[in-house]
Amino acid sequence: MAPKAGKVVPVVAPADAGPPPNLDFIPHRIAVYERLKAAAAAELASKPRVPITVTLPDGRQLPGTAWQTTPYDLARSISKSLADRTVISRVNGVLWDLMRPLEGDADVALLDFEDDEAKRVYWHSSAHILGEAAEKAFGCHLCFGPPTDEGFFYDFGMPATDAHGQPNKHSAVTEDDQKRLSTLMDGIVRERQPFERLVMSKEDLLEMFRFNKYKQVLINSKIPDGTSTTVYRCGPLIDLCLGPHVVDTGRIKAFAVLKHSASYFLGDAKNDSLQRVYGISFPDKKLLSEYLRFLEEAAKKDHRRIGQDQELFFFHRMSPGSPFFLPHGMRIYNALKNFIVSEYHKRDYVEVMSPNMFNADLWRTSGHWQHYQEDMFTLEVEKQQWALKPMNCPGHCLIFGSRERSYRELPLRVAEFGVLHRNEASGALSGLTRVRRFVQDDSHIFCQEDQVGSEILAQFDFLETVYGALGMQFRLKLSTRPEQYLGHIDTWNRAEATLREALDTFAARTGSAWELNPGDGAFYGPKIDIQIMDALRRWHQCATVQLDFQLPQQFNLTYMAAEPPKAGEAKAASEAKAGETKTAAAANDAKAGDAEKKEDGETAAATTTQAAAAPPPGYARPVMVHRAVLGSFERFIATLSEHFAGKWPFWLSPRQILLVPVMADAEGYVREVQAALKARGFYVDSDLGANTMNKKIRTGQLLQYNFIFVLGAKEMQDRSVSIRVRDSKGDLTTLPLDEAVARLEKLRDEKALGTELVEAGKKA
């Protein structure tokens, strides 16, 4: 039996809320729902009630009745506590509402909030509660209300008029509105409104949502004629939704409305501007309190705040989304770049530079013009269309194809720190994490198919080296062939098998595990997504490894094979190529186009449906591997800023050493030490101002210098330095100058994360 709904809590608007919102669309929506719900209930009642067997994950089997027994009933039969803490069920591998009857024999798993999928269901249901509150507060028209990796949000359009038909002066959400929404949500939770599922035809959906232009667009664009989908109801809210959801709104025990912002319908600046409200929820108040404390800590470590406090970078309205890196920010940038360059040298990469701007014909060949043009900065030069490059891969194809290549040159690892531009919507810009102008540690590896496995393993080693130097963990996810794909299925199967083997080899060596993300590969090849975890235990997508069979074909890239072709081989190759293109629809599929708008995706959908001619006898087509370790320098620096909380390790620090004289007579020695340290390539400053020594030291601490050298008469006499370590309690360690320099060099060159410099020193 379903939990009973509690007493309805009336909505009382605050005295200063202004005219009431127009809620005329709600009775119409409910009337359509009630009519169809009655028909659905009658159909359910006619279903045959026959015995079924339910199998739990531990192998236990429970009896049930088809079209009557629900997962909630099963949980309740085991224990009330299990039923109370279960968020959602999984039936035969598919997420299933707890109150939805089983239709036959089934494998059933009961999932609580600790399960990642259940957590997203919990937050999705919380978003519906927020949507109901927003409708009550503003009479708004709801758009999207999805879960995210860190909670949920709802987008909605504010109404043009109020209940009296007057122009609506309340066009944007305010801080006071957040409090009001929270109060309304609290009432909805106390009402314990059941979540109800109903299947509806496209025609009925268009009638139900005829007052909501956003839902009309979604229904017409996403639901084919003659088909149906589902809506979910809680209280007066009925929303277009695939579900599933929790049992009732009372399951949301603790929540918070966090922030609000603006967004665009469908993410397009040409469409309506919407209001977006974010929230978070948990099954108990303790978890919520812990999360809110986490947010406070994260706010202190926000890279935008650190960038301002340490004078690393800034933004200006004259070029939104394009950061200005200041001298100290460039020190971090260059340290990272030099690190990558040194690894390139060890790993036989060749560095190139390609133009920033290309004729549109290049992008037509690659497919970007057809599927990525709106995200590119375009311009007209001498009556021809051009564009700033949003990625380097087509230019690298031109480099590979600039002369004849031999198998002896492969793998050819082409690297570039190219300046890229992507036309992000102004509302999507966010510090260094979402910008319009950025640089990647971008490389493309052209190799033979039998070299892919070793190249992937080499990338894992690259990741270990770089992330290990930064003290960051990473995890790997394999994304496999999507429904719509280009190329021959045998090629896909071989590629996925190669990636699996490489992942298994790496996992066995490191004692780690990798995750499978089925069907989420790019349409042009499988990929491995790499996420790193920062000090706040947040995961960030930075690195990527993607296989690409299509761009080499689009640009007709070939190399001389190792052996001359045998008789009949050329004909066989030609016949094989005839099956390369699965379908023209695959290339134009919206999913492929949408996927390539992600910042980490490189290649847009190829619209050429005719496969390039097979390579001539004696030649073969290379496989292309897109890879990056840092990804965007800008985003990676943002991640590192928050990971280290602005306390940079010595090798990466923009402020390594501060020299402070004890008295004026020591200033000459300060200059001598500064010159010696600068000659060895260190970033060293001196404070010869009029402030007291203690104030100079305090200033140096606030600016996060790794070491403060205090120099006085004794240090001059002994040619030594007294060293104060960042975050120390005031202890000084004395070392001879030459020894201090040697230890500094070791600390920098070994990319140590700690302060080993003074461990063997003598306490002053």
How does the language model describe each region?
Residues 1-143, 147-149, 155-764:
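NTP/phosphate- and nucleic-acid-binding module
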